[in-house]
């Protein structure tokens, strides 16, 4: 029985991951495919709380990308206005800063990736 649990669990996890990815696609003015990755909230400090909304945007890639930095900037403003602001809770400490980040590939938060194209 245990032999079946691992493959079934993997299939279920992949199915759930696909469903989540499909649900988190966000429309932006440039029309590029943008997927919400996660939200990172810093602890309150002297500057207040910072909330980071991280998105995957493969079309900003240096090699083969089709979205210019100017178009990405407009997309980031739209993501702030239409995605991030509505999701900021009305209770608890309000953020002093909201950061929208786009990356052409998955990058672990806080780690550098010299091959990734990222806009903040």
Q: Where in this protein do the model-derived segments appear?
A:
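Polar/charged, Gly/Pro-rich intrinsically disordered segments
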Residues: 93-120
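Mature extracytoplasmic domains of secretory-pathway proteins
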Residues: 54-99
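Short linear motifs at secondary-structure transitions and domain/linker junctions
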Residues: 12-13, 23-31, 71-79
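Bacterial N-terminal signal peptides
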Residues: 7-17
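N-terminal secretory-pathway/extracellular module detecting exported/lumenal segments
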Residues: 20-65, 105-106, 111-114
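Positively charged n-region of N-terminal signal peptides that target proteins for export
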Residues: 1-4
């Amino acid at each position: 029985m245990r032999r079946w649990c691992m493959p079934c669990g993997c299939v279920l996890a992949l199915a759930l991951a696909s469903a989540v990815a499909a649900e988190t696609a966000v429309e932006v003015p440039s029309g590029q495919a943008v997927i919400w990755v996660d939200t990172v909230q810093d602890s309150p400090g002297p500057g207040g709380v910072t909330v980071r909304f991280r998105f995957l945007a493969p079309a900003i890639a240096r090699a083969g990308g089709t979205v210019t930095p100017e178009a990405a900037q407009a997309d980031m403003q739209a993501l702030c206005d239409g995605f991030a602001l509505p999701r900021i809770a009305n209770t608890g400490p309000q953020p002093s800063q909201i950061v929208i980040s786009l990356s052409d590939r998955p990058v672990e938060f806080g780690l550098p990736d010299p091959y990734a194209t990222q806009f903040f």
